[in-house]
Each structure stands twice: as C-alpha cells, then as structure tokens.
C-alpha cells in the first residue's frame, strides 16, 4: 500500500432536527395542550487511532465526510431520532489541525484514543417547553442548531523511540536490517529508501524499542531539496537520534565531516527542538577500512567534527559493534522511561495535593458562611423574618399549644 503521511479533509457534522409545534387532538378535548417534541441531535464526527493502519491514503481520495442530520420532533411529545455519528479511523501518530485557525484539534498518539473533530448540532425545542400559566397554547418552537464544519489537515508522525539520520547511502537501511526484523530495500545507489521504515529492536524477552529509518538527507533538505525533508516530521516524536556517517565513501571527493555537519545544520534549520534532541554518532562501514587504519580514521574524524555526546564504531553489514550500540540505546531509553514515570508520579501527587487544598478551601468557606448565617439567626436578622424578640406572641402561641 502506498505510504501517504499527509492529507486534507472536510468534516461536516449533522444539523440538529427542528422542534415541533403541535397540539393534542383527543376525543372530547377540542383544545388540547401543546405536545410538540424536540428535534434529534445531529451526528458528530470522531477520529479514532487504529494501530492496524499505517497510511492516510484513504483520506487522500475521500475528502468530504458528512454526518447524518437529526430528525425533526413530532406530535405526542415524540422526540426526533438523533443522527448517526461517524468514526474516522486513522493511524496511531496522526496529528489533526484546523486549517483555518491552526488550532490543534487532536493528537492520536495512543492506540484506541478517540477525539471529536466536529460536534453535531443540538436539536430544537418543541412547543411543549414554552407552556406557562399565561400562555397555555404556545406556538413557539426552536430550530435545530447547525453542526460544526471544519477543514482539517491530517499529518502522520510515526511513533518511534530512535530516529536514523544520515546522507543517502550511509547504510541506514542496512543497519535497521541488521538489528531488527524489518527488511527495507538495500542497494548501492542513493535514495533507495523512499518512505519511512520502522523496525522493532528486541534486546531481550522483555525489552525492546522502535527505530525509524527515513530517506537520506542532503544539503538544502530544510528548503525542500531531496526526499528527506518530507519525512523529517517523523523524527519529532523520537527520544534519541542516531546519526550514521559513512567513513569509507566510494566518492574520493566526499568529505564525511562536511556531510555530517551538513545534516546537523539541516536539523537546526528545520526545527530547533529536533536539533536539540540527544544525538549520537554511529561511524559506519569500518569493514571497508583496513584494520590498521581504523583508529586513525576515527580519531581524525572526531577531531575535525568536534564535541559529540556519544559515538560508536560499527559495521552494519557485518554487525560489528551493533550489539553494543543497541544495548546502549536500550539502557538510555529505559532510564528515560523511569525518569518520566517518576515525574508523572510526582505530578500526580502534586495535583492531588492541590485538589485537596482547593477542596479544603471550599469547605472552610462553606463553614464560615454557615457560622455567619447561624450568627444572624441568633441576633434576629435571619431569613425567617423574626426580629429576635423572645416575647414574640407568635412564639407564646406556639408554646401554649396542647400536645396531641
């Protein structure tokens, strides 16, 4: 199936049904009262994250989605039937924004997460609601509300823990094949990868992470050159970036240091938050370098490249160094998850304390108000209309009543 990660659609929720203005018609009751029912609500439109989907191709060709209108109210206090809701299933990781306002409508970042994208209109009121002691036969009713109408942008950002960076032909697809069960196309020409590939790396029975391979970047990618710029968004949800560098390029004019710095610069131009993510270097294709030259080649690269958070020396083709790398990534991710869970627990505890304090303040205000009311009653300024005189005749009359 073709990989589509962006689409634009229009959603139109159903209008509410109109209320009814009708009157009872019964035998021997020539002028019955109002009995008009309310209109049904219009159908709403929901977006649902479905892990079984991995592309937005369905929404590229079906752009208009309209929910059912609510039925009108009837006589005998019959309410109109509500319009049926529509559920639009989308891949996990889909971000929905309003094209007109730029508002974030929903971020479907978990399987089964559901969000309303267009709310159906409320049904109108029947004339039964407008009956009063003054107007016993109202002819007034209200029309149903219009449902929401929106133009939406759907943007798929794949959910992965690790994102692979690198120039075309840096060995990213070979690496993901070596460490996971994913089988992307591998060839000895640039831009072999035309769409993101996901692979699950399992370090043991209970530990794993997801790695994303996007098409190679070239200089000017942030301005739209090459293919990689179309898919940089898929790296925004990752927790660490793995930058693969070809230390043994076939082109004698190629400069690994210049190419690596160009990739980093493209990240900075595209998104500052992406640029600031943890970024590790994987110096690849060491199997093509004579063993006695490897240490010098690596040292020369690191000296010219500058400071780096962490670096690893690997050969994706032979697997050398890959095991050490994936276990280091797993440990880093596990530590991050533990820290995130601790922060979440602390946040939950703080929210619970804040809620308890707010509840205590409300209770204190209530008790203060209650004491004030009691004090007013004792001084005769209460709401019962008495002036606090103990010799009130009404009180004496009450106390002199015989007990039954």
Swiss-Prot record:
GO MF term list: GTP binding; GTPase activity; magnesium ion binding
State the coiled-coil residue ranges: none
What is the top-level taxon of the source organism?
A: Bacteria
Name the Enzyme Commission number(s) assigned to this protein.
Answer: 3.6.5.-
- Which residue numbers delimit the OBG-type G domain? 160-334
Transmembrane region positions?
Answer: none
Positions of the UniProt region annotated as Disordered: 22-43, 373-404
Q: Which SUPFAM superfamilies match?
A: Obg GTP-binding protein N-terminal domain (SSF82051), P-loop containing nucleoside triphosphate hydrolases (SSF52540)
Q: Which cofactor does it need?
A: Mg(2+)
Indicate the secretion signal residues. Answer: none
Q: What are the residue boundaries of the Obg domain, all occurrences included?
A: 1-159
List the PROSITE patterns.
G_OBG, GTP1_OBG, OBG
Recite the UniProt keywords alphabetically.
Answer: Cytoplasm, GTP-binding, Hydrolase, Magnesium, Metal-binding, Nucleotide-binding
Location comes to: Cytoplasm
Spell out the InterPro entries in the cross-references: G_OBG (IPR031167), GTP-bd (IPR006073), GTP-bd_Obg/CgtA (IPR014100), GTP1-OBG_CS (IPR006074), GTP1_OBG_dom (IPR006169), GTP1_OBG_dom_sf (IPR036726), OBG_GTPase (IPR045086), P-loop_NTPase (IPR027417)
Q: How does it assemble?
A: Monomer.
The family this protein is said to belong to: Belongs to the TRAFAC class OBG-HflX-like GTPase superfamily. OBG GTPase family.
UniProt name for this protein: GTPase Obg
Species of provenance: Aromatoleum aromaticum (strain DSM 19018 / LMG 30748 / EbN1)
Q: What is the lineage of its organism?
A: Bacteria, Pseudomonadati, Pseudomonadota, Betaproteobacteria, Rhodocyclales
